Amino acid sequence: MRQTKRAFLEGLSAGLQSGGQIYVSENGRPVFEEAFGEVRPSESMTTGHLLPWMSSSKPVAAVAIAQLWERGLLALDDRVADHIPEFGTRGKESITIRHLLTHTGGLRMLDVGWPKAPWEEIIAKICHGRLEPRWVPGQTAGYHRTTSWFILGEIVHRADGRSFDQYVRQEVFEPLEMRDSWIGMPVETFTQNAERLAPLFDTQPGVPVELNWSSEKRVTRCSPGANGWGPARELGRFYEMLLTGGTWQGVQILLPQTVEALTARHRSGIFDKTFRQILDWGLGFVINGSNEDSRSGYGHWPSASARAFGHSGYRSSTAFADPERDVAIAILLNGTPDENSHLRRMRAITTAIYQDLGYA
C-alpha cells in the first residue's frame, strides 16, 4: 500500500494531521491496517487508540432505526409525532422518520446545547422548535448536523425502552465485536480509557491547537450523530457487515433487503442548502455521486463506484463501502484543517487506496 502511505505522509508533512489510522478490507478480509504519526507530541499513534468519528457516527443511528423497522416497532413513513407527540407543533407536524434520515426535515438551525444540556432538555428544545421558513418536508434538503439525530435517538428510546447509547452498544457494537466502539461512552469507561482517547487538533494555518472534543462531557454525553469513538478497524467492520447483507461472521444485524433499502438512492439530484451543492442520500448514508456535480463536493471517494455508500465526519474522518469492489474503508485523522485542504487530503488518500488495490 505504498501510494496510501505516501498520501497520508504528505498530509502529515503539510501539517494537516499529526497522526491517524487507516483500515481497508477487500472481500471481507483485512488487507491494510496501520497507524501513523503521533497521538500526542512524542507519543506514537497505535491501532489501539480510540479516535472520534464525528458525523461518521450517523449511519449507526440509521441501522438502529432499521432494526426497529424490521421488528415492526416503527415505519419509515411514520410521522415523528406518532412516536414523540410533543414534536408535532410549529410546522413540524408532517415530518416523517424518512425525512430525518434523508436530511429533508427542516430543523437545521436549532442550537441544542450539547454537551452541557442533558438529553431530556435537548429533546424538549427540539420539540419546541419551529420548522425553517419556506421549507417543505421531504422536498427541501439541507444537511442536519445534530438536531434530527437526537430525535432519531429519542425514537429508538421510546420504541425500545433503552437509551440510544445502550441500544447501539448492545444491538450493534457488541454483536459485531466492536468492543472499543461507543456513542456516548459510560463515565467509568471514559476514566479507564482516558489515555487511549486521541485528541483532535485544529490544524488550520498556524500552530496546531488541541480541541476539547475528548473532554469527559463530549465523550460521555450521547450525541447520536456526532460523538462516536473507536478504532478505524471497528468502524470498517461496521461496513463489512453491510457489504455482506447485514451479517458478520454468522451474526445477523439486518436483513439483506433492509441493507438494500438503507443504501439505495432515496434523494437524488436535490440541492443541499447546507453544503450548497447537489448531494445524493440513502437513509442515513451519503451515496456516491450519480453525476460529476455530486462527486465533486462533499463526497471524499472519487475513485469509488456510484454505488458506494458511507459518511464522513468534521474535517477528520470518512468511512464507506463500495459494493462493486467489495471494499470497506475507514480513515480517522487527528487534524482538522480548512475545508479545501481536508477535501484534497481525503480524496488523495482514498484515491491512493484504490490505486494500491488496482482499481484506479
Show where each model-derived region lies.
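Short Pro/Gly-enriched beta-strand edge/turn motifs at strand-loop
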Residues: Q3-R6, G299-A306
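Short, surface-exposed loop or secondary-structure junction motifs
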Residues: R29, R90-S303
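A short, polar/charged loop-to-alpha-helix boundary motif
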Residues: R40-G48, D338-T351
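Short, glycine/proline-biased beta-turn/loop segments that scaffold the active-site neighborhood
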Residues: A75-R90
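Short glycine-rich, acidic/polar surface loops and turns
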Residues: A306-A308, G313-A321
